Structures are given as C-alpha cells and as structure tokens.
Amino acid sequence: MKALHVHLEGYTASFRRPLIISGIKITTLPAYSTLLGIISACVGRTVRPHETRIGFEFTCSGVAEEIERTHRLQFEDGRLRAHSKGLGISKRQMYTDPQLDLYVTNCSLKSAFEHPCATPCFGQSQDVAWITNVGEIELTPVSEGAIGPTLLPYPQGGVAGLIVSLPDWFENEVRGRTRLVGPIRKFEAILPFTRTRYHIRRADLFHPSDAPRDEDVVYVHVW
C-alpha cells in the first residue's frame, strides 16, 4: 500500500485531554482526532476519517512544566468581562523536543504537506511545529514486528504503557454550537520518551519501506 511519510518537529508539545478540563496535565500521546486536526490545518479544510487512514509514532526528550500568562474573565453585570485583577499566571505541562512521524494513506495530500495552508501545532498555538520531510513510501502488511510510541487499540499484550480513553474524531460543522464527539475507544499509549520498541502481533501492522530496521512496524488505525 502506498502512503506518505511526513516528519514533523517542534520545541514543545502539549496535547490537552480532549474530553475533560484537565488543568495542567496533558494527554500521553496525540489522539487520532488531534492528528486529523493537524492534517486539516495543512490541507486548509476539515479532513474526515473516511478520507485517509493514519499511523504515527511520537517521541520526545522528556516532560517538563513552564509558567505562562493567562487571560482571566469574571462574570459582572450579566456579562463576561476582563478580570479586575488583570492577567493571571498558571503552570503548563509540556513535552520537550517533540517529533512526530505521520503515515497517511491518502497520497493526494502530499502537496498540502509540502505547502501547508496553516501552521501545524503540537497542541496549543504556541506549540509550533514544522515539517522537515514529506516522502512517498510503501507500507507492507505484516503480522508482527517491533513498534514504538503510538496508540494501540486496547487490549494489546506485550507493551508497557498507559490505558487511555480518546475520541477518534469530532464533528464541528455548525458554527456557534459545541462539537459532537465521535467514537470513544480505549487505547494503550506507549510513553513517548521510551526508546524501547516492543515486539507485538496484531492486525493492521505495516512495515514502512523507509524504516531503519527490517523488523520495525507501525500500526495504521482503522476508523
């Protein structure tokens, strides 16, 4: 199967938990809904799940906290207004030196990654990412192999990670309305700062033709 391999890098990443107000905590890995958002930013329109399958690996050098300014609001005279005490200060958890290897099965999107309509971000708008490489590759289906930090459908034996509930996508077509949540699934998230590749067996594993090792595989998500 032909696919695109897109490599993105950044200074920081902070993927917020998409279903709850999470304070400073971030999601272990970007949700597949987040990856659709990154692709949509490059394309310049909403990219829907039926248009492409997605595989990915996300790595970083570590996790840290920083302090940032916040714009506070207060309810006064029946309206939301700027807080009388001015700006606030809060902590923000983030990943450092993030790198994303994105595998997209819709090769017609290549020009969008080469000339993106908007700046892709690793979470918030200050987490600016840049694309360093876009290439056409071949994904060969295999039954087993060594996999790195990604989201695998739960349960998946043979890996160390966290179990997380994340949406596949959101519907956000009606202006002024809250977005609608698509299917919510449980995944096993392999921590992004681990350097161990786990040997697993499952369906929907593929060996990228540009992988550094013959046993390396990626999971390509089925919506």
Residue map of PLM features:
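N-terminal, Lys/Arg- and Ser/Thr-rich interaction peptides
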Residues: M1-I20
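Extracellular structured ligand-interaction cores
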Residues: A3, E51-R53, D97-Q99
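Short secondary-structure boundary micro-motifs
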Residues: Y11, S40, K85-L87
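Primarily extracytoplasmic ectodomains and periplasmic/lumenal surface modules that are beta-strand-rich
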Residues: A13-F15, R45-P49, L109-S111
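Internal, well-folded beta-alpha domain core
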Residues: S61-W223
